[in-house]
Amino acid sequence: MPILGPISATEARYRQRDEMRESNLGAIRRREILTIAANTPELVRQRIERLHADPDFVLSLKHNGVAFDPQGPGRCPQQFPRALERVLATNDLMGMRFFEQGLRVSRAVGRIHIRDSGGGTLGYGTGFLVSSRLLLTNQHVLPSAAAASRSTVEFNYQENASGAIQASTMVSLAPQELFLSDEQLDYALVAVAPEPGLAACGWLPLIEDQGKLLVGETVNIIQHPNGEPKQLAIRNNQVVDELELFIHYQTDTDPGSSGSPVFNDQWEVVALHHSGVPKRNPANELLTTDGRVWQEWMGEQRIAWLANEGVRVSRLVRHIRAQALPPAAEPLRQELLGATPPPLARAPATNLVGPPAAGEGLTVAAGTATYTIPLQLNVSVSLGGAAGTVAGVAGDPQQELLGLFVRQPASASAPTAAAAVPAAFRL
């Protein structure tokens, strides 16, 4: 099985963009990502609005050359939410809600068992639910309906807080109900059998709207590298270029696994990971992270990568929408294109800090995955407050919890998006 995907085509695209990418990297180093050519004024405005900030206020600060002190007191967080500080690289602090939401998102990500006609395992890939009955992965993972019919997807294959593997759920694929794929976009969309346990996984909407990501932001990947228990690469892949169909993101340590969802910091899916640009020696052989010549038995997670490539979600949705389907499959597609994920039940909390004082405590959702966190990440936790919850939904008639996201009331000036993370700042 070609576990590495279309590397040659990815490498060619990457080399063709050397000059543009170096220009982008220069702007990123100077913390001037709003000047990057791919970040057009309209896209920047859409991104700012999606973060529930005031675009006129933010852009006026940019034009006036005002610097920010994100630790200072004072201005309205609606004008400059902390999420936007991270976009502009002025604040790397992440609230604990970010990790709780990441755990809940991860439920929809599964390990694909790729099997031969005799039932033997050929390899593994990653896939994720994009509706209650549809799974998205790479075409090089499931190249045909016949291959999909032999394969299965396993959810909840991950370690718990004590390091033990949790009980997982194996689900059959149902390509006879729906199977779509495309070689250029390297995606396969396949129906899954209607198992009762799927409801607990939820699903991740494919949002066609613009404004989910700017060049210069970091992205997060949830994956099963080489078939291993579920892992998260958090904020250690930086988007360095945007093409018509793809985005390129660089990392020093974290590869992506074929078929993995790529997320922004609001846990919206922005790309389908499918390939990368590996390091090579003078003989054009692939190298491992410790400098050896790579062999396929080592698994793709051992390759030393220069960059990763993901297929843009907006292009995937556009292609899926345009394909001819038999009438019986149309309801499945319409759920993907238009339905909203139902609210996910919170998993039972686990006490991590010993017996708390009355009214105090710290909880996280059960079902812990492995985090891959860069050393620069600083997390500040206060144990003096109430147990953590998803912000801003209980008792608030103006907000609605949908899957992982808090949906704000629609308005003419701002699109629906993940709830803002408030933060004070000072001019």
Task: Give the location of each predicted region.
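C-terminal cap/linker of serine protease catalytic domains
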Residues: 1-12, 16, 20-24, 195-199, ...
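Protease-domain processing segments flanking chymotrypsin-fold serine proteases, especially trypsin-like
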Residues: 1-125, 338, 342-356, 360-361, ...
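Residues in intrinsically disordered, low-complexity segments of regulatory proteins
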Residues: 67, 79, 202, 266, ...
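Serine endopeptidase catalytic core focused on the charge-relay Asp
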Residues: 83-117, 121-124, 128-132, 136-250, ...
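Low-complexity, proline/glycine-enriched flexible segments
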Residues: 153, 256, 360-366, 425
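N-terminal accessory interaction module
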Residues: 364-397, 404-407
